[in-house]
Amino acid sequence: MTNSKILICDDEEGVRESLKLILGDHYNLITVDSGEMALKALSNCKDVQIVLLDIKMPKTNGLDVLQEIKMKSPHLKIIMVTGYKSVETAAEAARLDASGYIVKPFKSQEILDTVKKNLES
């Protein structure tokens, strides 16, 4: 699994750095700070297996990015990592076929377990 490639998309540098610390020893990581950059990275890198995607970002809503990614790559695993705790937002992410939903602040083990589970499924 250490060769698995994960795209991290979050506008907060601290969150990106935390995820890099948690996942960097286990996976190959690409980090971007916007939905637009995530879409660009995915078009340039076809071997990404999982996307960790924030919802609230400047310019682009993560749910819109999720929907656009799923139209192009329906089998790509996308895990939402967000500060939104609402059932409605989680339900919308599930409806759009998100593979997981993690609320910030997150625990390292929660990230590792969710990524591992998605890689194995």
What are these regions (language model features)?
Residues 46-52:
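Active-site beta3 strand of CheY-like receiver
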Residues 106-115:
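C-terminal output helix
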Residues 34-37, 61-64:
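Acidic catalytic/metal-coordinating carboxylates
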